[in-house]
Amino acid sequence: GEVMNKVKEQIKFDFANNCFDVLRLYSAFYVMTLHIFRHIRLQEVSPVFDWWNGVVVLFCISGFLVPASMERSKNTWEFLKKRVLRIIPSLWVCIIVGVIVAAAFCGFVLNKTFVTWFLGQLVFIRDLPQPDFISNFGIGNFQANLWTMIFTVQFYIITAIIYRFLKNRKLWVWIFVMILSMALNLVVPHLQEILPEAGRLIISHSCMPYFYMYFAGWFMYRYREKIVPILSKTKILCVILFIARAIYCDRFGVRIGEYMDMIQVLLLCLMTVGFGYSFGKIRFKFDLSYGLYLYHMVVVDIFVQIG
């Protein structure tokens, strides 16, 4: 009896026993390093560095952790408040800091363009004409790394909406939603062609192409008891398959889906969760990854400006 209980205890999956903090920090650091090389040292970075896509890893980890946070919340509203309030104030501060820094280097001009553009930034609308002093500063594209934030907020809202519907459904429903979210990614280019300008704008600000990356994390969270033990054993196999697929895509110029090859993305998601549960529990008191992710472009821009 005692032996059986011991075995059961070992098999019992421990959700908290993960090192996602490290992976998050690593990914944010990775994105930062890539931007620094690209913009400050102005050299072409080997495509190999695009394989490990920090954004995909961050989306996938969100998908794995956010539904858990939803479960712990008293209600949907509390969840949204907790999540969105974590992101938005710090994002606004970051945007304001970015504007102040740009103004310090290039002089501040208050006009209609600036006001519309600035309000747009605050509500995640990225495609508005930039004021000149912003375009003249740094790499000329204001905080190019913030484009993922609008999708993160959308993920939270979608989670809040469909969580109850999905919660106790059978496996086939989950598989169906997974396939549907992959299909959304695949139809994006066709929609871009047939839709009028307004529709195109909506799509470029929507998480359609990225939702499957987040949902892959959610799917693994839902079936974590079965999936995680397998993934922590097969993670090296996933890495080998991932590298093989990446080499194949590079070699033959193949890419399934928008943004990044779908097979690579899914393998990367499997790797993320596999590695996340391979090193026991590692937690940071402060989550640096978000701050790094937010602020590194301000620094990059200053360096580019000083030249």
Question: PLM ranges: what are they?
Answer:
Residues 87-153, 264-272:
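Membrane-interface helix-loop-helix regions
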Residues 21, 38, 119-260, 301-307:
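Aromatic-enriched alpha-helical transmembrane segments of multi-pass intramembrane proteins
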Residues 1-16:
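Short, Lys/Arg-rich, polar N-terminal cytosolic tail immediately upstream
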Residues 242-307:
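Alpha-helical transmembrane segments of multi-pass integral membrane proteins
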Residues 70-78, 165-168, 221-234, 275-287:
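Membrane-interface junctions at the ends of membrane-embedded or membrane-associated helices
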Residues 5, 54-86, 90-113, 299:
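Juxtamembrane transmembrane-helix termini
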Residues 15-71, 88-91, 208-209, 293-297:
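Functionally critical transmembrane alpha-helices in membrane proteins and complexes, commonly lining
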